[in-house]
Regions:
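N-terminal small/glycine-rich loop or linker at the start of catalytic domains
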Residues: 185, 189-223
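Glycan-recognition surfaces
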Residues: 199-207, 272-307
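Acidic/aromatic-lined carbohydrate-recognition and catalytic surfaces
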Residues: 1-200, 257-286
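Short acidic-aromatic active-site loops that bind/stabilize oxyanions
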Residues: 48, 220-231
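Short, acidic/polar
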Residues: 1, 226-244
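Short catalytic-loop micro-motif centered on adjacent basic/acidic residues
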Residues: 70, 249-253
Length: 307
């Protein structure tokens, strides 16, 4: 016997192939949290079982064998082409489609590529010409630009293409450090305003929302207007899988970049249904294990990738 008693799976939700990286795309580019990836359908069952029924049976079989089932949830990012855009274009960041090829991570002279964006560096970040160029690329969402036109196109099948055609807009890709932009995913707008810790460095707050090192790290930098409807949506991902399939745990992707109040919503809502529900933190530093435990996690990924 191998002694395995937990099955942990990479994301199983439906994901998008738009602007994919590589040939296969990434399951972390989730386009619909609540739908299972249709590619997971077992061809052997044909029409005798639905995909949902297959996963439900899988979880049941694991439980019969005294094995727990854990999934991966992705509440910090979403695919650049996703099912939430139609009703919530304001939950995302936008740039001009015609300037897409110019979009890149801003660099700041004197600050290393992998430096933690602590507050003492942020004034220098905002004074950088490259940062100024970067944040000026961002635009207001299409609905706010022209609500009448938005209502005409929002139900179109190829919505992303329609937005490009009618508004010259695309969702801005996510990025991290000096890596090339993550072309297939973007960040959620966790707050409806700018971070209170750094907005003093802006020339004006009368500008579109933007992605920058501080807005990415919403665990460190907070607005005063939480995007409550979005938070409630994200906090219901795990309960949805509990209700439908009876899963036993989840790893929270980029949980380290979530507002602490949202993280607590996610953890507490899951444990209202199952007090023994387990969470894995995407924490690579063993020295932060106690912090993860205090936040409600049961375990961390650890430093196995770098050993």
């Amino acid at each position: 016997k191998m002694g395995i008693n937990v099955v942990y799976m990479l994301p199983i939700s439906k994901f998008s192939l738009k602007d994919k990286k590589g040939d296969l795309g990434s399951p972390y580019g989730v386009s619909n949290f609540n739908e299972l990836d249709p590619n997971l359908k077992d061809y052997l069952t044909k029409d005798s079982m639905t995909l949902d029924e297959e996963f439900e049976a899988f979880v049941e079989a694991c439980h019969i064998l005294n094995m727990r089932v854990m999934i991966d949830i992705i509440p910090r990012t979403n695919a650049v082409e996703n099912d939430l855009i139609k009703d919530h274009p304001d939950w995302f960041y936008w740039i001009k489609a015609s300037e897409y090829e110019k979009y890149k991570v801003p660099t700041v002279e004197g600050i290393g590529n992998t430096t933690l964006p602590i507050l003492e560096y942020m004034e220098k970040v905002y004074k950088s010409e490259d940062t100024f160029r970067h944040i000026n690329m961002f635009q207001y969402n299409p609905k706010d630009q022209n609500k009448v036109l938005w209502n005409k196109i929002k139900n179109k099948k190829n919505l992303s293409e329609e937005i490009e055609k009618k508004f010259d807009l695309r969702i801005a890709p996510a990025f991290s450090d000096s890596q090339p932009p993550w072309t297939d995913v973007t960040f959620f707008r966790m707050y409806e305003d700018f971070p209170k810790e750094t907005k003093e460095f802006l020339d004006t707050t009368d500008r579109p929302p933007y992605i920058l090192f501080d807005t990415i790290k919403s665990n460190m930098y907070h607005g005063e207007k939480p995007n409550i409807k979005l938070w409630e949506k994200l906090a219901d991902i795990v309960p949805s899988y509990q209700r439908r399939f009876g899963i036993d745990g989840a790893r929270i992707d980029m949980g380290h970049a979530l507002p602490s109040k949202l993280l607590q919503m996610i953890i507490s809502k899951a444990r209202e249904n199952d007090e023994d529900f387990s969470f894995i933190a995407e924490e690579l530093q063993v020295s932060n294990a106690q912090f993860a435990y205090d936040a409600g996690y049961n375990m961390i990924i650890g430093n196995g990738f770098t050993m």
